Amino acid sequence: MIGGGSWATAIIKMLSNNIREKEIFWWMRNMDAIEHIKKYHHNPNYLSAAEVNIPAANISDNICEIIHAANYIILNVPAAFLKDTLKAVNPEDFKGKKIVSAIKGIVPDENQIIAEFLHEKFAVPFEDILVISGPCHAEEVALEKLSYITIASIDVEAATYFASLLNTRYLKTNVSDDIFGTEYAAVLKNIYAVASGICHGVGYGDNFQAVLISNAIREINRFVDAVHPISRDIKESAYLGDLLVTAYSQFSRNRTFGNMIGKGYTVKSAQLEMNMIAEGYYAASCMHVINKKYKVDMPISRAVYAVLYEKHAPQMEMALLTEKLS
């Protein structure tokens, strides 16, 4: 496991239900957190009620040491920090391993989803890349509330095996071969959750939210069909379900961020007060650039970009958006 946040902690908790703790290796950069976990068996900063009984020797701030010890490498840091996290890693370190992305984001500056970034920068074959996605907040996993996730990979056999490591009485898994659609849908839903929050912040109610999200899933469908035109059911939980929970949930940091923007916070002040990464902020800029190539009609995504990066007034931009929805 590469990452020390709430989703990383939740996945560690799930894995420890199915495999021996001594087979789990965990990297994080925070030495104080590492020492705390070694001594008290819980993460002091995220999901602190979740017990993690990994041997002390298996938790380290040496990323290459952790990667060399494992066959499946789970990347679980904010997309904006991925390049820096992997700066000591060489393509040879990933050779022969399955790389699992639990990152629902896009790499800034590169404007690439995680699978594309790994393939181009680390020569990881697409067949060796897996994606974890779906409507699954870490907070509810920690509380053992029933949740569903999707494991996507071109190598369906590997996805099925990895899914079996996560299956518990409170977590059900699905398997898909659509890594590109799954990743792009996960990136886009963060933008639409920001839009949902902005609309709530400026005073729109549930009726409009329903229209907004209905249009958002159509935008996702249009875009993923343009990028990777295969047969897929956009109503599956990896697409529609993930959008719904991110747009509506109290745990959604992207909705929270958008709500603050709608209420008049600047981007910087909202980020400082949240003290967490809202992936939708970075995704809005990246998708704006990517869509210059595909030219898909995406008025909601464009409106979020206008508010966050062109400093358009949220109230005015959302009012303009209402004329483009149906």
At which residue positions do the language-model features occur?
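NAD(P)-dependent Rossmann-like dehydrogenase/reductase catalytic/cofactor-binding core
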Residues: 196-200, 225-326
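Generic structural signal for well-ordered, non-membrane alpha-helical segments
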Residues: 4, 8, 30, 82, ...
